Design a protein with these regions (language model features):
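Glycine-rich phosphate/diphosphate-binding loops that line cofactor/substrate pockets in enzymes
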Residues: 86-97
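Flexible loop/turn connectors
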Residues: 145-251
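Hinge/beta->alpha junction and helix N-cap segments in small-molecule ligand-binding domains
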Residues: 11-20, 42, 74-84, 100-147, ...
């Protein structure tokens, strides 16, 4: 997308506070960049975003930031997508539906958990705290979270990422149970591994390629037409039904 509009892409990996302190002053002082896309959604990113906004730099945040009233961002409707995924499980007849959430320090984790709760509540299904475990978007985290959930005997699990779903399904198999016969799963992201897992994963597909291209389009709009008012773009998702949800067993 950058090449299409005659811009050059520069990539900066900022994984620590030290990285932030070294990289961003150079960007601001030397005028190296016309604009910046920040991959966000974590509470700790708010300071970085704030510095860019205060400097009146064109900024697009990929992933809704915690404070979004004065900065442009592009995202999906995580609440709606999670709600639709859980409602699909409810439609298959599951009632003891657990969730492995994302970190509570991220808007993604918070929003997808909210969607899970919204779906259950709209169908008058009681919210059981024993069926909600916080994860960390890693396979190991998904495995550990599923081990914590197994004593609560969930019929189905909505995981906030495919990577955690892979770990969680492995924990189910290691416990001598079967997917989806004993525990069904729905993930989130539709990464390539979703279709390559031992049991192909039903999951929410994000428009990853379009997401990046749209972020660049919005950034160029900010550069060429001014940063006010902020632009907000919500991309669509879709549920991809595969074997892990048990639809064939229940259909």
């Amino acid at each position: 997308a950058c090449n299409q509009y005659g811009y050059t892409l520069a990539l900066f990996l900022v994984s620590t506070k030290e990285d932030e302190e070294q990289i961003f002053p150079r960007i601001l002082r030397r005028g190296l960049l016309d604009g910046i896309v920040i991959q966000s959604g974590h509470h700790g990113d708010q300071a970085i975003i704030g510095r860019m906004v205060d400097a009146k730099k064109p900024v697009v945040v990929a992933g809704r930031p915690f404070r979004s009233d004065n900065v442009s961002y592009i995202d999906i409707d995580n609440v709606k997508a999670a709600c639709q995924a859980v409602e699909y499980l409810i439609g298959l007849g599951y009632r003891r539906i657990a969730t492995i959430t994302g970190p509570n320090s991220s808007t993604v984790g918070i929003d997808r958990k909210e969607g899970y709760i919204k779906a259950l509540s709209s169908h008058q299904i009681a919210i059981d705290p024993a069926l909600i475990v916080e994860g960390d978007f890693t396979e190991a985290g998904g495995y550990a979270a599923m081990q914590a959930l197994l004593p609560a005997r969930p019929e189905a699990v909505f995981t906030a990422s495919d990577i955690m779903a892979v770990g969680a399904m492995r924990a189910v198999r290691d416990a001598g149970l079967r997917v989806p016969n004993d525990v069904a799963f729905v993930g989130f992201d539709d990464l390539p591994l979703a279709n390559l897992s031992a049991v192909p994963l039903t999951t929410v597909r994000q428009p990853v390629v379009q997401f990046g291209a749209k972020a660049v389009e919005v950034l160029i709009d900010l550069i060429e037409n001014g940063i006010d008012p902020p632009r907000y773009v919500i991309m669509e998702t879709e549920l991809v039904v595969r074997e892990s949800c048990g639809a064939k067993l229940r259909g």
